[in-house]
Amino acid sequence: MTSPITEPVPAGRIAFIGGGNMARSLIGGLIGRGTAPGDIRVVAPSLSTREALQRDFGVATFESAAEAVRGADVWMFAVKPQVMPGVCAELAEAARAARPLAVSVAAGITTAQMERWLGGDVAVVRAMPNTPSMLGAGVTGLYANARVDEAGRQRADAVLATAGATVWIEDESLMDSVTAASGSAPAYVFLLAEAMEDAAIAQGLPADAARTLVLQTILGAARMLTESGESPAELRRRVTSPGGTTHAAITTFEKGGLRELVARAMGRAADRGRELSAANDDTADSGDPS
């Protein structure tokens, strides 16, 4: 795993296909670490999106993907999975000529699918960021196909590290587990916070007090996990005194099957990722990117 980088990202022109929240986060991170706005090109179908990107970052924006990728050696695909086959088909001829490094942050899209849709013989990195990446506090799982050389891996890592930590996976089949462990996982924490708030309010605490208590506890616990160097199990043991209040709560969680429920939920998330990948193939084969 790497920590978020502070040094400049290697030079070169980067084209973003898609100008949504994730693209904005990465663009802001790149510029903050020394990438010239003139080296970033963005295609977005919406005029208001293009105008906002120009205003906020000073980057060049385009309505045409073919124009946006011209002269770029890194293509960042940040569009919805269901439109990816059509977007790639539009760029296949340019990809065959330019041989770019293609980086996809679309969920459920495999490197084989990207390479095939772009016409073959393309270096592809598959990235799975999570939503805290939009705050520069996320983590991204990365997988590179065999056509990506070490320089390409470093370049992809440098771009995604502007949004948080990075973890490289050497077996692409495990990217669905990355989705389960981090891509979807912020929602698990949100659900826990929601349940804790509801329980605190049910016990009589005012809603604003319940929210502050729960959110600051989650934030503090996360800092302890990242800064202490101790395992989650060890930290839990340290605050769980036999016969105490924490012990009563933890025992209730364990008897209620919390571990098994988490394992089932994460397993279902990974399974759903595989199902979506297969559906992407079906969509592309039908010729209907919608």
Model-derived regions: residue spans:
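Rossmann-like NAD(P)(H) cofactor-binding subdomain of soluble oxidoreductases
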Residues: 26-27, 47, 57, 65-142, ...
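NAD(P)+-binding Rossmann beta1-loop-alpha1 motif at the extreme N-terminus of oxidoreductases
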Residues: 1-71, 201-203
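NAD(P)-dependent Rossmann-like dehydrogenase/reductase catalytic/cofactor-binding core
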Residues: 2, 8, 215-290
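Internal alpha-helical scaffold of NAD(P)-dependent oxidoreductase catalytic cores
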Residues: 113-123, 139-177, 188-227, 272
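Small-residue helix-packing motif on alpha-helices
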Residues: 40, 50, 68, 114, ...
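Short pre-catalytic strand/loop immediately N-terminal to key active-site residues, enriched for Gly-Thr
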Residues: 14, 125, 174-180, 232-237
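Catalytic, metal-anchored helix/loop core of enzyme active sites in primary metabolism
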Residues: 181, 193, 279-282
